[in-house]
């Protein structure tokens, strides 16, 4: 029986999350979510269950409202890196969820790395 796209996505998400939990060592998690029209990123402290910084194309100040392209993803990556630096965060691990690491997700990760985040 062939797996649907959604089933494959859920399998990837569980596999990625389990690997990250095994190597977390108390670091923060940079979680990324991509929809058909927007992309968002959050720095999450799983130990306390708190979001420390967030950025999204839904923010009007970013100027990419309703856009989900590589340029908008890079802008979100730069923004989350700036907000992480302002909060005193330098290291985290990248949680791509079930999304493949290319295109928009890769652009966000590269921009966050250029902004000073280490993962």
UniProtKB/Swiss-Prot annotation:
Task: Provide the alphabetized UniProt keywords.
Answer: Ribonucleoprotein, Ribosomal protein, RNA-binding, rRNA-binding
The record ties this protein, via Gene3D superfamilies, to: 3.30.420.100
GO terms (molecular function) for this protein are:
5S rRNA binding; structural constituent of ribosome
Which InterPro entries does the protein's record reference?
Answer: Ribosomal_uL18_bac-type, Ribosomal_uL18_bac/euk
Among its keywords, does the record have Ribonucleoprotein?
A: yes
- Its GO CC terms? cytosolic large ribosomal subunit
The text of the family note is:
Belongs to the universal ribosomal protein uL18 family.
Describe its function: This is one of the proteins that bind and probably mediate the attachment of the 5S RNA into the large ribosomal subunit, where it forms part of the central protuberance.
**Assembly with partners or alone:** Part of the 50S ribosomal subunit; part of the 5S rRNA/L5/L18/L25 subcomplex. Contacts the 5S and 23S rRNAs.
Question: What is the protein's name according to its record?
Answer: Large ribosomal subunit protein uL18
Q: What gene name is listed for this protein?
A: rplR
């Amino acid at each position: 029986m062939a797996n649907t796209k959604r089933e494959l996505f859920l399998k990837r998400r569980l596999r990625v999350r389990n690997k990250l939990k095994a190597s977390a060592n108390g670091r923060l998690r940079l979680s990324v979510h991509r929809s058909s029209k927007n992309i968002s990123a959050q720095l999450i402290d799983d130990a306390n269950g708190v979001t420390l910084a967030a950025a999204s194309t839904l923010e009007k100040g970013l100027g990419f409202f309703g856009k989900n392209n590589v340029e908008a993803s890079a802008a979100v990556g730069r923004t989350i890196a700036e907000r992480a630096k302002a909060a005193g965060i330098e290291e985290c691990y990248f949680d791509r969820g079930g999304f493949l690491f290319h295109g928009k997700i890769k652009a966000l990760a590269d921009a966050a790395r250029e902004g000073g985040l280490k993962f």
